[in-house]
Amino acid sequence: ETEVVYLKGCDYVDETVTLSEFDKMSADGRKGMKASFWNNRTLDGDPMRVTYFGEPLNLTNNGETAFAPDVPVVNFSARFEGRYVPAESGEVTFHVEGDDGFRLLIDGKPVIDEWGEGHKSDITYVLDAKKGRGYDIVLEYYQAYGSADLKFDLGERVPLDYKSVASQVADADAIIFVGGLSPHLEGEEMGVHLDGFRGGDRTAIELPAVQDRLLQALKATGRPVVFVMCSGSAVAMPWAAENCDAVLTAFYPGEAGGTAIADVLAGDCNPSGRLPVTFYASTSDLPDFEDYYMDNRTYRYFEGKPLFPFGHGLGYSEFSYGDATIKPLADGGEAVAVLNVPVTNAGQMAGDDVVQGYVRNR
């Protein structure tokens, strides 16, 4: 039997972490927040469902997932309420990330107001909290169309202690680090302005530094490190490529992606994917982003050494190729020839291979 222990290592880009105090909130005698949902955008009338959340909010309608049972996946609104009593005095950071509109009120006073639609926002507010004093927290949200996302937590922000994180997994037989990028960082126009990311565009292709440093700390434990890299585009990760025991590029694998990744890591499925784009070693390998010429871009014109070339991919089996033959066709159809390539699985595990053929004019 295999025991899997989960630990959040770091955020995508930020080198600080939140020491959550969500459990210092309560509603109706329960830890956490009371949640009321309406099947309209305006919180009008009686709520159609009332429930409670005991953990920091991390809600989405991706994959037609509802925020709570019976709640619509579009055109709805919600109010989350809780009373927060800090155990110590000091600065407490409230972090809200949402799509579409949201607003945060503390003791009835709006401190975050992003009551708009059609864009993603990531906002923080810092409260100078007093020990033992109660604060009434209200978070309101509405979904207009498209994606519905809402994340909320509160607590002290502290620098990430890489060695501490690594020490907590140092006795594992293997360490699986799932990182990379997120659709909340790259994509269409969005309110993101972080190192390497601007408004949905990427200003650098490197793996965010916080993840690179954490991978190095994990590798220093001496345990095997597998990097599961999620992204929607190429990522430069030369250290990981050279030092991790394995890198599994998952892109954004969808609702059943976790099961598929587990099957590959457990050896129940022989991976056969191939890269549909070139992975470069550095942003400096590429021309200026605003230079639209194709010189020194893509597998066709890149003049340097790629980190991983277009079409690259490994599996658990070795495949051998026989002599290829080309048979011209004379039937006048669209095809002019047939290419035959004998392929043999020389490994011990059943698997698929992707035969790649490239044609160019001379």
Give the residues covered by each predicted segment.
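Short acidic, flexible loop segments centered on an aromatic residue
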Residues: 96-102, 107-108, 348-362
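Surface-exposed amphipathic alpha-helices with a cationic face
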Residues: 215-223
